[in-house]
Structure formats: structure tokens, C-alpha cells
Amino acid sequence: MKFKQDFFTQLPEFYSQVYPQGITKPEWLAWSDDAAQLIGLSQPTDELLLGLSGNAAVDGATYYAQVYSGHQFGGYTPRLGDGRSIILGEAIGPNGAWDVALKGGGPTPYSRRGDGRAVMRSAVREFLVSEALHHLHVPTTRALAVIGSDLPVWRESQETAAITVRLARSHIRFGHFEFFCHSERGRADKLIQLLNFTITQHYPHLSCDAAGYKAWFLQVVQDTAKMIAHWQAVGFAHGVMNTDNMSILGDSFDFGPFAFLDTFQEDFICNHSDPEGRYAFGQQPGIGLWNLQRLAQALTPVIPSDDLIAILNQYQEALVQPYLRLMRAKLGLSAVDVPSVEQDKQDLDLIGRFTVLMEKNQLDYTQTWRQLGKLDPTSKHSALRDDFIDVSQFDTWYQAYQQRLGAVADIPAWQTERNSVNPKYILRNYLAQEAIIAVEEGNLAPLHLLQKILTQPFAEHAEHEDLAKRPPDWGQGLIMSCSS
């Protein structure tokens, strides 16, 4: 790997230098070939294993943990920072630079009495969801590898430590800006320094002046809205949408008790620590705006409040338009040639009525969409009909759907197109749990198979139909904890 160290050299007050503590008996548990290509790597090697497990220095790495703050479950925490993630620097790849971070690399000045470690189950989950989201075309950070060990760590019980090697276009979060506005009051100079660095590194087409700052914030609003639109379309619940878990680039970030929907449930809660459902699936669009409002507050020393409010008012449209594009594709609806508020409203109503029917009939979100690939959209009798208990309500919806759909000239091509946007396979929590149990027993095959399937989620994989099934009773609606 070749590194540059722009964050390290240009923002010395934004981190603490800290070196990883190696894990014992490191071994490769998982590796992503296409993530490796992002930073110019090919195959895992013994030398790389030593370096990324913290047992040897990596040439060109500088090792640091970033400081930031954030709103967690609605309350402001003035000092957070990387409590168990150590960044090596920005690795230069063929198409840009990616931060390389060792998540679980050991304690840092921001560990808050924690051990700085990650357990194997959380490392595997982060790796798998990074692979899954990327191949579902959802903006996300990536995971290069999972490195296991025999190092014992204690959570609710004894587990073993592991490291996720995370790749991110940037680790700058909403919380970085909050820290230098609220926690370090009077440091507007540092806020501007961070803002200029972010624009120079990631938005080079913008200028570092008043006009550029406003254009940048609008881009952040749009990118955040687009990310959440993808989440809602694919049925992904993040679970911990604190502002310190929000990437400034609109990439899905910092995965913990996430889940993909099994049975469609608008108020689905995937986080055991969120009993009131602040971060429930259906709340994510609103929380996205709330988090952007907190970021806007932090930017008031730099951008006038009236301008910030005007930009925030564009969030709804920035969310609805990509969501409509994604959902129209899932349903096979033709794109709207001339934007129409009335047509958007009608399509949103059609989509909403369909998901309400899914919830009332307790249907699997992913499987129901996939069924469209078997549908003859010209037939009065839908193959979907048998899945619905309340067939009269479905018939009413289906009639409206056919009317909006219009004529379909090539039915096989239409069906193939539906299968290209409606995945057959998602990372169901129970599948991740089964892979984790197998790893604990020394069997990596289920993990590697699941990874393979998740990198081709739209393919049939007829020999692995079992991985597309609804979860068994024990795996239905699994709720995870933040313990990791």
C-alpha cells in the first residue's frame, strides 16, 4: 500500500497519535477482492496479516484516532472520538484514496474505559453488511478483511477479539463539526480549517468561500438524503443513527445492530438499546433531517442561519426524488418524462399502499418484490394474489398498478429487468448469526459462501435457494444489541 497523510499533516488538532496493540494468533477470516482493488492490493499475504493485525508496522502508516463529538439518541455528548478504531492514513488506489482503519485495533485516548477491541461477531457482521450494501448499490464504506485471533475479551461473556479493516473515502463525520463548534467553543478557526480541508479533499470543484460553503452544505444534504432513500428502498435499518455515525459524504457508516427487513414492518426496531424506536426503520428519513439540523447548528459560525434553513428545506425533495426513482424501477413503472408534482404524489401513494398491504399481510419485503420477476403484468390474475390474505384490497391496488404501468411490449425483458433491481438475497440477521456460529466452531465455509452470494444478490443461485428463504421462527425479526 502507498499512503498519503493529508489529514494527519494538515489537521494536527483533530486526532491523537496512537499505535495499535497486536492481536495474538491472527488469521484471515474473510477478504474482499474488489475492496482490495480499491487500494491497489490483490491477495492477502502473511506480511499484510502481521501489519493489519497490529503486530508489525505498515510502511507509510502514521496511526491515529480522530476526535469528534455527537448527538446520541438525541442528547449531546461533548467528547467521543475513535474509541477502538485506529487509522493508518489514506491509501492511494487506482481511482482515488481511501482511509484504512483497524476497527478493534486497541485502546485509544477516546476509549472511555473500554478495551478498544471488537469481538469476532461484530467484525464479521460489519464485513458482511459492507459487502451486501455495496453490491445492492447503496452508498457505503467498505471492508477489506476480517482478522480473527485467540485473544479473549469480555462483553456479556468471554468472546474472542477480531479486527475489521475498514476502507472509507473519509472518516469525517457530522460529529467532527459539532466538536469544534460546541465542545471547543471559540474555535471557529478550526471549524473553518476542517471545512476547507473537507472541500479541498472531496469537493474540489467548490471554492473555500461563502458561496462554496453553501454549495457544500447543499451537497451534504443531498448525499445524506440519497443514502437514506436507498436504505428505505432496499429495506435496511441502520439502528444507531447518532450524528457521530453520519458520514459527511453520505456513505453508510459505523454498523452495529443493523438489520434488513424480513417481514415488512414500518416501525421495525433492530436495536435492543432503542426500545422507544427513535431509530426504527420508518423513522430514518426524519432522523436524517434531524441530524442535518444538528450539523447546520454547528455551521452557524460559518454559514448564515437563513441560508442553512433554506438549504435544509430542500431535504424532503432530495429524499423523495431518488426514492421515487428506485421504487419506480422496482415496480417497473416508466420514468416520468416531465416532472409532475401530481404524478409524484400518485406514485408515492401507489408505493405506500403496496407496503401497507405487505405489512397487513405479514409478507417478506425482499421476497415480495422479487415475485414481480415472475409476474405477467398484462394478466388480470396476478401471481402475487395468493400471498395476500385480503385479496380484495390487493385487487384494488393491482388494478391501479396495471393502469399506471401501461402496456408492456416484451414481458420476458420486463421480468428480467425486475430481477435486476429487486434482489433475491439480502443479509438476513439469522444468516449472519449462522455464519458467526460456524466461525466459532472453526468452519469458515458458511461465511465465505454467504459473502459470495451477497456479492451477487440479483442472481438466481438455484443451488443456494435456502439462503433466500424467510428466516426460521428463531431468526424472525432478530434484535441485536450495541455490544461489540
Swiss-Prot record:
InterPro entries according to UniProt: SelO
Superkingdom classification of source? Bacteria
Q: What EC numbers are recorded for this enzyme? A: 2.7.7.-, 2.7.7.108
Any idea which positions bind ATP? G81, G83, R84, K103, D115, G116, R166, R173, D254
Q: Which UniProt keywords apply?
A: ATP-binding, Magnesium, Manganese, Metal-binding, Nucleotide-binding, Nucleotidyltransferase, Transferase
Top enzyme class, one word, equals transferase
Active-site residues from the entry: D244
Please give the catalytic activity noted in the UniProt record.
Answer: L-seryl-[protein] + ATP = 3-O-(5'-adenylyl)-L-seryl-[protein] + diphosphate; L-threonyl-[protein] + ATP = 3-O-(5'-adenylyl)-L-threonyl-[protein] + diphosphate; L-tyrosyl-[protein] + ATP = O-(5'-adenylyl)-L-tyrosyl-[protein] + diphosphate; L-histidyl-[protein] + UTP = N(tele)-(5'-uridylyl)-L-histidyl-[protein] + diphosphate
Q: Which cofactor does it need?
A: Mg(2+); Mn(2+)
- Record: residues binding Mg(2+): N245, D254
Molecular functions per Gene Ontology: AMPylase activity; ATP binding; magnesium ion binding
Function of the molecule: Nucleotidyltransferase involved in the post-translational modification of proteins. It can catalyze the addition of adenosine monophosphate (AMP) or uridine monophosphate (UMP) to a protein, resulting in modifications known as AMPylation and UMPylation.
Stated family: Belongs to the SELO family.
The protein's name: Protein nucleotidyltransferase YdiU
Species whose genome carries this gene = Shewanella baltica (strain OS155 / ATCC BAA-1091)
